[in-house]
């Protein structure tokens, strides 16, 4: 009995390293099993919410202890956030989730100034963090021990498809004047000339997405929430906040013709947004998330400079990877087009091997905007004057997962 107890204690104290495992993100060639320990202090007598505004976790990476600091992404959901799906006979059903705790966080690693993190704490810790310049993924292991998590480098995930992933936007590059040195300095977004802007966002998951996730709306919901949480992290340096005001799942059938021709699908989706969605859902921008395989290497398409326009404030995104970060980066890229950003040319730099806006999406994920993207956005604001992103959305510190039954409202 004593020997068994000692073994259990050792497993909890020291990470286990494995050579290969199949995880949600795919086949992983090298990983560690870790046991994150929550170390957030709670004042004596205080009522502890399920998901605090700030949390800290300790665990080991490569044998070295790390402390992950997390802060809740307040304002991730608007106060009037809604979800819509369709009954088998085609009736539109909209729910308004109760306003309570949510479990999506941004964060950093202690003593690493360049670290970042985007984490879901809904069921264990799931997401990604940057540590000492390398991207790591973390997710709970489906073991009897509910505290066990896998941590692994992004580069150790076997790629499902070696073909390059591309944006379908075509653009003629312009030569840019040298960017002011303010972009290289440790200045606030306001000091760099980025006024606070708010984008009220609707995500639509098409019928193929519903089929891909076996009609499990919870999985689709969590997948989308993680995407938008990461998008907020990416756009924080530009002082842009994305508030999710609606999630619509085409659970019965597609409401437009979704084809492998991305330009046709984008045009149809833009028309549908103008004639249907805008009539019943207040929002600034809509993105279609589809499980169709677009022709060629295209995984996304959007209208350049279309933000706040009735038809053109849209994009279409292929759900092309089992790694949530990669799909989030694709959507962040297409939203960049909506905000006036062109593709990066060779003269564009962000201090990393790749940036957010290349025409060919890099196999080294980057959440940094180039100097060119920053200038494009700064030019877009006064020239296009997008009024819809000026207003602060109805926001709340927290939001919940949907409830059923008496919260169903037929439109």
Curated annotation (Swiss-Prot):
Disulphide bridges: 308-388, 348-372, 350-355
Active-site residues, record numbering mapped to chain: 334
UniProt KW Chloroplast keyword: no
Top-level lineage group: Eukaryota
InterPro entries per the UniProt record, alphabetical: MetalloPept_cat_dom_sf, Peptidase_M12B, Peptidase_M12B_N, Reprolysin_adamalysin
Enzyme Commission (EC) number: 3.4.24.-
Residues given in the record as Ca(2+) 1 binding sites: 200, 284, 388, 391
Span of the signal peptide: 1-20
Organ and tissue specificity: Expressed by the venom gland.
GO MF terms, alphabetically ordered: metal ion binding; metalloendopeptidase activity; toxin activity
Co-factor binding comment: Binds 1 zinc ion per subunit.
Gene3D superfamilies, per the entry: Collagenase (Catalytic Domain)
Primary enzyme class: hydrolase
Keywords annotated in UniProt: Calcium, Disulfide bond, Fibrinolytic toxin, Hemostasis impairing toxin, Hydrolase, Metal-binding, Metalloprotease, Protease, Secreted, Signal, Toxin, Zinc, Zymogen
Domain Peptidase M12B positions: 197-393
Function: Snake venom zinc metalloprotease that has fibrinolytic activity. The recombinant enzyme cleaves both alpha- and beta-chains of fibrinogen, but not the gamma-chain. The recombinant protein does not produce hemorrhage in mice. Cleaves the peptide substrate Abz-LVEALYQ-EDDnp at the Ala-Leu bond in vitro.
Record's subunit section: Monomer.
Protein name, entry field: Snake venom metalloproteinase ACLF
Organism of derivation: Agkistrodon contortrix laticinctus
